[in-house]
Structure formats: structure tokens, C-alpha cells
């Protein structure tokens, strides 16, 4: 999908705030198309995140607030719509008339279309943020918006924690009889799309927390004040992305043969590592008995299996053990200090606006009409994006296979000696990275030291 620079600038220029009650209008669909194509362009030209002063990045940052408002609005619409669907489903269960059932099916089909489009819209904006937040040099320009984005992230994580894998799990198609395939997919598609959003929310949080040193003090204070550890640690325990022997990986449920951690769980562990051990966070996080007991819940997960996949967790384990044997007496509740608080004004403004106009919003959602021309145009965009993604996946798979062949060839050429050098200290190595099988180390200590340099390469093999 070849999008030219001039087209990208045009798509960005076309981004404007759409009125709440104009969602799903013809004007909104044009906006939606622009968002989708901007996201595709950025991921196809992701080298721009490393270039200081790139015009393309500067252009998209000027529209950061517009995209943020749209993201938060779509989130609240999703939340409101989800509540309404639950009420409707409860009423439908009482209806048995065949004609009514037919009408219900038609209505459900209609709802599925705009539900899908709405979730796709939210995901496209979130994907865009996830990518640009990898760039260190943009944080100063978006500093005032981070607290609103964090409020969105926090609200989603709270919702995610209230769910379970039962809501999302569908057996892989290869394991289903034909009679069950359509039934299963129709039943869980909407829920799986929500799961994808929750996972992207965690990825976005990871990108922010990795750069916590770039945030101003007031924002860090607010992040600490949210006490997100009280959400993240229970999420690690609940694991909504894991169901029996399956994990949700690369947007599908797969059999977890080697009991590896799902990528989303690795992301959570690295976020926890930073929030618990980072000096900036430690200085601002007032330890209480309740908070201490929450962190100690992680103790039972500390083992060699975790260290092999995430070597830095050994350092976290040391901290947790010190916390466990500590004789320090922590207060039951945190002290109340007078601090300058930051309110997520954009988030609260949109929330209040939607609640104030709840009846009109629900009426709008119940009376959406999408013309065939608009639906056809959007479908063409989706198909192009799908084909583009499929092409990239095939290319990555081929590269991975070629790398594997080259690695095997190199190993054969080395003969019986099989001598490798440590990725960290360049001494002779005998230990192999259990995840990517590409890096070697002389000791666990060297593997831990090299992890933050190696992890990006390592993750590309998973």
C-alpha cells in the first residue's frame, strides 16, 4: 500500500474535530479514512521516529490533541454502547416470537457493522500513538496531553481487569469443526476486538513508562497517584490473555506448547520492573502496608522460567525479597500532603459532555444509516490495509526463515568446535538466549546486562 508523502500531509491536514452527534456521518467516515491511512503510512515509514525535526512527525504532532480527543470520545462511545447492548440482550432473551427473532438478527448484523468500524477507528488512533510514543524527542511537545492519555489508559486497564479469558477465547479455526466456525466467530468477534485494544493500551503504556524520565514532575506525580500497580499486578494474576493451554498472540489464540509468556505479559513485567525499581518512581511512591502486600504478590512468579525469558526480573526478585524480609514498619495509609494536582481536563470534559448528552448519543447510535457507497469505500480501504499487512507478515516470515537458514549454515561451518562469543563482554559463551536462539552469553549476569539492548532484536523472533 504505497502512500506518498504529499498524500500523508493531505490526510493530516484534513484531521479536524468532529461534533459528538456527527459520528458515523459521511463527514466522520472521511475523517475515519484519513486516520486509517495515516496509521498505515506511519508504520510503513517508522524510521521517522528516530529523526529529530522530521516535518512529517512535526505535522502529526500538531494534530495530537485532535487525535487524542477522538480517541477518548470513541472510548466513551464504546463504553456507553457496550452498556446499552447488555441491556438490549437481556430484553431479547425474553422474546420468543419468530418474527421478532428475525428482526433481532437484522439489528444485530447492523450493530456488528458500526461496532466493528468504531473499534477499528479507536485501534487506528491507538496504533498511531503507540508508534510515535517510541520517539524520545517528541515528549516535550506533547507534555501537556500525557495526563489525558494516561487517564484513557488507566480507564481501559480497569475495564480489562473486570474481564476474563472466557469472554475472548475462541479455539483456533484449525481445531474447530466446520459447523462451529461461524457460530464461534460471530459470538466473540466484538470481544476479541476489545481484547486487541486492551493489549495495544498496554503496549502504549510500556512506551510511556520506558520514557518516564522525559516526563515532567507533575505528570509523574499523577501517574504515581493513580497507583497503577494496584491494577497491573492483579492483571498479571488474572491473565485474561491466557486460557488453559492457549495464549493470545499476534491477534489470535494459539496453542502454547512451550509454556512461553505471551508478549503482552512480557510487556506488563517490564512496566512493573520500571515502576517498582526506577529511582524517579521510588522517590515518589510512598510505601504502605497495602502497597507492600500488593507487590509481594509477585513473589510467587519469580523462578528460572521467568528469568530465562526476561533476565532483568532477577533484579526485581532481589528487591521483592528485600521487601519481604524488611523489618520496616509501613503506615496503613499514605500520608496526605498538599500537592499541586493535574486534572485530565480533556478526558473529563469529553466524559461530562457524553453523559450530559447520553440520550441523544444513544438515539444517534440506534439510528445509524450507512450508505452503500460509503460502506463500499471503507471496505476497499480495509481490504487494502489487510492485503498490506498480509504482505508484511509474509515478508517477515521469509526473513526469519532466511536468518534461520544462515544461522544453521554458520553453525555447520564452525564444525565441531561450536565456539560463540558473549553478546555483552565478548568472552567465550556457552549459554544461548532461550527465546530467539540467536544470542549467546558467558553468564546469566551478562545476559541481564545486555537485555535492554537485545530485547528489540529478540522480540522480532517471537
Question: At which residue positions do the language-model features occur?
Answer:
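Cys/His-coordinated zinc-finger cores
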Residues: 394, 400-401, 409, 432-457
Amino acid at each position: 500500500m504505497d502512500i506518498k508523502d504529499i498524500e500523508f500531509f493531505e490526510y493530516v491536514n484534513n484531521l479536524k474535530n468532529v461534533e459528538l452527534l456527527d459520528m458515523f456521518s459521511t463527514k466522520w467516515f472521511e475523517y475515519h479514512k484519513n486516520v486509517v491511512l495515516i496509521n498505515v503510512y506511519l508504520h510503513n515509514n517508522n524510521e521517522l521516529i528516530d529523526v529529530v525535526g522530521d516535518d512529517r512527525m512535526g505535522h502529526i504532532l500538531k494534530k495530537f490533541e485532535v487525535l487524542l480527543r477522538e480517541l477518548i470520545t470513541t472510548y466513551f462511545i464504546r463504553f456507553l454502547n457496550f452498556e446499552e447492548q447488555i441491556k438490549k440482550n437481556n430484553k431479547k432473551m425474553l422474546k420468543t416470537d419468530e418474527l421478532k427473532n428475525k428482526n433481532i438478527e437484522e439489528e444485530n448484523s447492523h450493530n456488528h457493522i458500526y461496532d466493528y468500524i468504531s473499534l477499528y477507528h479507536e485501534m487506528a488512533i491507538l496504533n498511531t500513538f503507540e508508534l510515535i510514543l517510541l520517539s524520545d524527542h517528541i515528549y516535550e511537545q506533547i507534555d501537556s496531553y500525557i495526563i489525558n492519555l494516561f487517564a484513557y489508559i488507566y480507564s481501559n486497564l480497569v475495564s480489562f481487569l473486570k474481564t476474563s479469558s472466557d469472554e475472548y477465547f475462541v479455539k483456533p479455526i484449525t481445531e474447530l469443526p466446520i459447523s462451529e466456525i461461524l457460530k464461534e466467530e460471530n459470538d466473540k468477534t466484538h470481544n476479541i476486538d476489545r481484547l486487541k485494544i486492551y493489549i495495544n493500551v498496554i503496549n502504549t503504556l510500556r512506551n510511556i513508562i520506558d520514557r518516564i524520565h522525559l516526563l515532567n514532575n507533575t505528570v509523574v506525580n499523577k501517574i504515581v497517584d493513580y497507583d497503577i500497580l494496584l491494577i497491573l499486578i492483579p492483571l498479571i494474576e488474572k491473565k485474561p490473555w491466557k486460557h488453559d493451554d492457549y495464549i493470545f498472540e499476534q491477534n489470535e489464540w494459539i496453542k502454547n506448547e512451550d509454556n512461553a509468556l505471551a508478549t503482552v505479559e512480557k510487556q506488563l513485567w517490564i512496566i512493573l520492573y520500571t515502576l517498582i525499581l526506577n529511582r524517579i518512581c521510588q522517590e515518589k511512591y510512598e510505601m504502605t502496608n497495602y502497597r507492600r502486600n500488593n507487590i509481594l504478590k509477585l513473589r510467587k512468579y519469580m523462578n528460572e522460567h521467568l528469568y530465562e525469558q526476561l533476565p532483568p526480573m532477577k533484579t526485581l526478585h532481589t528487591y521483592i525479597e528485600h521487601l519481604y524480609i524488611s523489618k520496616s514498619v509501613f503506615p496503613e495509609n499514605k500520608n496526605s500532603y498538599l500537592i499541586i494536582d493535574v486534572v485530565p481536563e480533556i478526558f473529563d470534559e469529553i466524559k461530562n459532555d457524553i453523559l450530559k448528552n447520553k440520550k441523544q448519543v444513544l438515539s444517534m447510535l440506534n439510528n445509524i444509516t450507512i450508505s452503500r457507497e460509503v460502506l463500499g469505500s471503507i471496505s476497499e480501504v480495509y481490504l487494502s490495509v489487510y492485503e498490506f499487512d498480509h504482505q508484511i507478515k509474509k515478508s517477515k516470515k521469509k526473513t526469519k526463515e532466511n536468518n534461520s537458514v544462515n544461522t544453521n549454515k554458520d553453525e555447520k561451518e564452525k564444525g565441531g568446535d561450536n565456539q560463540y562469543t558473549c553478546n555483552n563482554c565478548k568472552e567465550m559463551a556457552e549459554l544461548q538466549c532461550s527465546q530467539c536462539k540467536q544470542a549467546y552469553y558467558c553468564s546469566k549476569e551478562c545476559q541481564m546486562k545486555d537485555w535492554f539492548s537485545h530485547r528489540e532484536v529478540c522480540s522480532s523472533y517471537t
